[in-house]
Amino acid sequence: MQRDFRWLWVYEIGYAADNSRTLNVDSTAMTLPMSDPTAWATAMNNLGMAPLGIAGQPILPDFDPALGMMTGIPPITPMMPGLGIVPPPIPPDMPVVKEIIHCKSCTLFPPNPNLPPPATRERPPGCKTVFVGGLPENGTEQIIVEVFEQCGEIIAIRKSKKNFCHIRFAEEYMVDKALYLSGYRIRLGSSTDKKDTGRLHVDFAQARDDLYEWECKQRMLAREERHRRRMEEERLRPPSPPPVVHYSDHECSIVAEKLKDDSKFSEAVQTLLTWIERGEVNRRSANNFYSMIQSANSHVRRLVNEKAAHEKDMEEAKEKFKQALSGILIQFEQIVAVYHSASKQKAWDHFTKAQRKNISVWCKQAEEIRNIHNDELMGIRREEEMEMSDDEIEEMTETKETEESALVSQAEALKEENDSLRWQLDAYRNEVELLKQEQGKVHREDDPNKEQQLKLLQQALQGMQQHLLKVQEEYKKKEAELEKLKDDKLQVEKMLENLKEKESCASRLCASNQDSEYPLEKTMNSSPIKSEREALLVGIISTFLHVHPFGASIEYICSYLHRLDNKICTSDVECLMGRLQHTFKQEMTGVGASLEKRWKFCGFEGLKLT
């Protein structure tokens, strides 16, 4: 019995963002007998492949695929290497040729390959349902299943009377296979009747079930992600500390012994702290806790000694690092000196062009590395000196006025500049010493380049010294100005004390004059205005109320007076205006909640009354 194998090369075309087309090959079923070489040649010719050229000989013999298959051997497919029927890659600009698909009850004819692909709507999330339009009027649900079951498992079909239907697949990728059939012309059997033909249009469809399943899947993925993150956080979380035992005499003796041991001190002191925070200290256990606290205190000296030892080790390590860095810097200077000596015309002419280039590159690299190490060494020295200067500054206590602080900041800036110049001077001296050492090690010959470098360094050194002297002179001038300001400040303070003494004497004289002029004081006491300040206030308030003929509240008056003097009290002002009844009068304005007290100036009317 001859069995037919059904194969179909399906080319799925997906448009990427850059309008480039990617080609995927998948194999689905079509009726094609394996023993018919003519059918295979036609199919391969449609695919743009050269025929195999085997006439009258079947590509594969007739056999039962269920028989004769050994364990571990996969089924034979046209894509298997060695059969020679794997299609070559198709150029992207070449139109894709679709094939005729033969089914039991119908035939599908491909669209024109030169036409653009059919348009589709935006794909809904989790889409498993497709819309199929253009069905023949005589098409049945069985024919629809026969055509689209090649794309995958069909869960449900909803067919309408108007030549369209909705098909729901089991998986999302099956929708892409169904979209491949969009544009195909379908013919039922061999009939050419209009009711037996149609043009398929396949598009994405929205379905509540698809959206619900997609949301459930997203929630499941979110739960899995949260669970994974929680497990990761729990894995990275530090372990909980062990529980602390409750206080007892036996545990107290154990903790007291651990407190005396350096290796177990941390554990024991944590237990002691927990007991104290729990409130285990009482009159009966106070002595035990005091002895444990005393044992903990005995470790203070040990910790201080350890800190001092570590600081000493750190200083020694810093010193070793500084010495090693100085040694490395000296060796770099020697290497740079070798490069400079090789760059002289006496030796330079004997090197090739490539060798000269390499020597120049090496020299630049060595100089850069030397400068970096030199800056690092100078930075270490600068930090040490700044630490010492910071310690000196912290010991001094400065209590100066604004002008004095400005001069101090200028003096500090000059001091820092002085220090930086001193450090640069040390660096130049080190370079001069290194150059002298190089001169002693290299041949005792006249080197115009080195002499020129020495002259330049000496000139720079002299310039730095002159600049340093100028800065020191400016620093001395600023210090002299500072001292002068201090003297001026003392003189001002003395003058202020003298003025205070004179003021006290004047107040005493005024008091004696008041005692002698008692009748005058009596007349003054009888006046409603008791001082010159109150007279000034009366004048200012009168002027203010004169320009406010409808009156003003006491708060409004006081807000105006506060602009002149913040020490004016509202109650004093109101009392003063109440005493002068012929000058100011109070009226009530408004009704109910808007009731308000207003003061008015009545000096012109009071003048007539008095």
Curated annotation (Swiss-Prot):
Posttranslational mods: Glycosylated.
Result after altering C510A: Loss of activity
Chain segments annotated as coiled-coil in the UniProt record: 293-328, 381-505
GO cellular component: cytosol; external side of plasma membrane; extracellular region; plasma membrane
Tissue specificity field: Found in the sera of cancer patients with a wide variety of cancers including breast, prostate, lung and ovarian cancers, leukemias, and lymphomas. Not found in the serum of healthy volunteers or patients with disorders other than cancer. Probably shed into serum by cancer cells. Found on the cell borders of renal, kidney and ovarian carcinomas but not on the borders of surrounding non-cancerous stromal cells.
Phenotypic consequence of T71I: Found in a patient with autosomal recessive hearing loss; uncertain significance
Effect seen on changing C558A: Period length of activity extended to 42 minutes
GO biological process: electron transport chain; ultradian rhythm
Class of enzymatic activity (EC top level): oxidoreductase
Segment forming the signal sequence: none
Effect in UniProt of substituting C602A: Period length of activity extended to 36 minutes
EC number, as in UniProt: 1.-.-.-
GO molecular function, one term: oxidoreductase activity
Effect noted on mutating C505A: No effect on activity
Residues covered by the RRM domain: 128-207
Effect annotated for changing H546A: Loss of activity
Activity-regulation annotation: Inhibited by the antitumor sulfonylurea LY181984, the vabilloid capsaicin, and retinoids.
A Pfam family of this chain: ENOX1
UniProt xrefs under PANTHER family: ECTO-NOX DISULFIDE-THIOL EXCHANGER, ECTO-NOX DISULFIDE-THIOL EXCHANGER 2
Comment field (misc): Has several properties associated with prions including resistance to proteases, resistance to cyanogen bromide digestion, and the ability to form amyloid filaments resembling those of spongiform encephalopathies.
Family: Belongs to the ENOX family.
Protein name (Swiss-Prot/TrEMBL): Ecto-NOX disulfide-thiol exchanger 2
Native source species: Homo sapiens (Human)
Taxonomic classification: Eukaryota, Metazoa, Chordata, Craniata, Vertebrata
